[in-house]
UniProtKB/Swiss-Prot annotation:
Keywords: Cytoplasm, Exonuclease, Hydrolase, Nuclease. Its EC number is 3.1.15.-. The active site is at Y128. The keyword Nuclease applies. GO terms for cellular component: cytoplasm. It is an enzyme of class 3 (hydrolase). It comes from Ectopseudomonas mendocina (strain ymp) (Pseudomonas mendocina). This is Oligoribonuclease. The lineage of its organism: Bacteria, Pseudomonadati, Pseudomonadota, Gammaproteobacteria, Pseudomonadales. HAMAP family: Oligoribonuclease. The gene is orn. GO terms for biological process: DNA metabolic process.
Length: 180
């Protein structure tokens, strides 16, 4: 059910960090309420890319996405970028009105750069604000290192897992770092 207070969490996996030469290869979304309770998980989409594009990945991306099985899922996928964008928007429309949720995640500015270039309709679905868990991680590292160090991520670099970890990390900071 649509609620303007729901939050949209998104994560992208890309072939690299530069939107001018790299592309999106996987995306996932989760919608939570304002208390960070998961309401729905959106589609997890491997986006088809050519073998030539995949061969252009650097060593870190080649190893990481190869070991996780993502590279093979991308090769086998029949879903292009436009279809992935449309499927994700259709999911979000069920839960959050356009322009209401900030874009939520970890280092989410990087994801938004790719959305702006490759999925402008999806990028425009978000409010202009960011809910970036990385900000709290940086602040906790400076002001309360024991709080930062007490949260361990598995770092699978798979989009849905990364979102789940971002939500769990924000819950951790809410409990141990943010004081009402």
């Amino acid at each position: 059910m649509q609620n303007p207070n729901n939050l949209i969490w998104i994560d992208l996996e890309m072939t690299g960090l530069e939107p001018e030469r790299d592309v999106i290869i996987e995306m996932a979304t989760i919608v939570t309420d304002s208390e960070l309770n998961v309401l729905a998980e959106g589609p997890v989409i491997a986006i088809h890319q050519s073998d030539e594009t995949l061969a252009g990945m650097d060593e870190w991306n080649t190893r990481t996405h190869g070991q996780s099985g993502l590279t093979q899922r991308v090769r086998e996928s029949r879903i292009d970028t436009a279809t992935a964008e449309a499927q994700t928007i259709a999911f979000l429309e069920q839960w959050v009105p356009k322009g209401k949720s900030p874009i939520c995640g970890n280092s989410i500015g990087q994801d938004r750069r790719f959305l702006y270039k490759y999925m402008p309709a999806l990028e425009a679905y978000f409010h202009y604000r960011y809910l970036d868990v990385s900000t709290l991680k940086i602040l906790a590292g400076m002001w309360a290192p024991q709080v930062k160090d007490s949260f361990q991520k598995t770092a699978t670099h798979q989009a849905l897992d990364d979102i789940r970890e971002s939500i769990a990390e924000l819950k951790h900071y809410r409990q141990h770092f943010l004081k009402a």
